[in-house]
Regions:
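Alpha-helical transmembrane segments of multi-pass membrane proteins
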Residues: 2-247
């Protein structure tokens, strides 16, 4: 009965996009973790990806009337929302292109922007953080599915919730599908942390140019997306999309 239920909840597409594959998610998550460590450790303790910390610090400094410091956290927030808008514009404008997927355009734009960040000196940290936040927002808006499940490649809270939920369900039902789902999320979380660890170490060796390693990881994802593969799409993914990717 469980297998019959599972059959109804899973759809297979023979011409899937590698942008939704686990392999692509690996490189995006490594890059996402590296970006966050880069801006926090090297660019003035600003979170480029998860904006919750920036909102907290912005609010605190506004309350204390530290306007210069408040601006320090407001700029990446503004850049993030603009990045989401631009990614959506790219999707609507280039979704019907056949030669290249619109998500590849997002990745290529992100690579070029992050490459430029590597040339910015430390006295331009505010600009560097703005560009990284903008790029991150494009990525999180464009890549919201992994093997048919909703996920985020630049932050962990939604992935942790979904991974734990699936693990709890597996312990109750012993359904291997939910175990596979949970493991996918925990692997992505580990890879994000691994990327952050690499980024945090590399800044002491490569300085501003550490962000170029993120570019290299994204470039792998860019070329992977020329491949087509069969993917699964799960009905619960549609429910998750509303919550996970936006957290």
């Amino acid at each position: 009965m469980l297998s019959e239920h599972k059959k109804h909840r899973t759809k297979y597409h023979s011409h899937g996009q590698m942008s939704e594959s686990f392999l692509t998610a690996v490189f995006l998550s490594l890059s996402g973790g590296l970006q966050d460590a880069y801006t926090y450790v090297y660019r003035g303790k600003v979170f480029a990806n998860a904006q919750t910390g920036n909102i907290v610090l912005l609010s605190q400094n506004i309350y204390e009337q530290n306007w210069t410091t408040a601006l320090h956290y407001f700029v990446p927030l503004l850049s993030f929302v603009l990045g989401v808008a631009i990614a959506e514009w790219i999707r609507q404008s280039f979704q019907t292109w056949q030669a290249i997927h619109w998500r590849q355009i997002v990745l290529l734009s992100e690579i070029l922007l992050l490459f430029a960040v590597g040339f910015l000196p430390e006295d331009l940290n505010m600009l560097a953080n703005a560009v990284v936040s903008f790029s991150c927002a494009m990525q999180v808006q464009a890549f919201r599915k992994m093997t048919g499940y909703a996920f985020a490649s630049t932050m962990c809270i939604g992935n942790m919730r979904s991974g734990m939920e699936a693990l709890f369900l597996y312990l109750r039902t012993h359904d291997r599908g939910t175990l596979k789902k949970s493991l996918c999320y925990w692997k992505i979380i580990f890879l994000f942390g691994f990327g952050a660890g690499i980024g945090g170490h590399f800044v002491y060796v490569f300085g501003a140019k550490t962000i170029w390693f993120s570019c290299a990881l994204l470039l792998v994802g860019f070329f992977l997306m020329f491949i087509k593969e069969e993917i699964e799409e799960h009905e619960e993914m549609h429910e998750q999309l509303q919550g996970i990717a936006g957290k």
